[in-house]
């Protein structure tokens, strides 16, 4: 990501990037979250696995174990207040689609989703 910012002629310090929620802390989600953190972006990491949440806790701004297929869980976390959410649930396509649908219903403005079928 830093290379992209340099290519645009901007420094990381000159760009105010709002916090990002990353849902799914597997290989892709955790790598993406680490890269965002390395570039000064605050990251809330959410995963259904408490083990993954514990493993990522030292590296992210905040981590939470939650079932994101449950719209009430997303509401309780205040996810609708964040501008950008990345859905990185790769191994369960149905969960990824349901989570993305819940985010749309909550009015999240910018949703990026990755899924493997």
Model regions and ranges:
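Cytosolic regulatory regions of ion transport systems
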Residues: 1-117
């Amino acid at each position: 990501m830093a290379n992209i910012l340099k290519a645009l002629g901007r420094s990381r310090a000159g760009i105010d990037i709002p916090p990002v929620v990353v849902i799914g802390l597997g290989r892709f989600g955790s790598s993406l979250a680490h890269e965002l953190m390395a570039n000064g972006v605050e990251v809330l990491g959410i995963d259904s696995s408490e083990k993954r949440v514990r493993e990522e806790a030292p590296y992210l701004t905040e981590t939470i174990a939650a079932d994101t297929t449950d719209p009430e869980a997303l509401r309780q976390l205040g996810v609708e207040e964040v501008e950008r959410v990345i859905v990185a649930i790769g191994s369960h396509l149905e969960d990824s689609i349901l989570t993305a649908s819940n985010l749309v219903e909550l009015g999240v403005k910018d949703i990026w989703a990755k899924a493997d079928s």
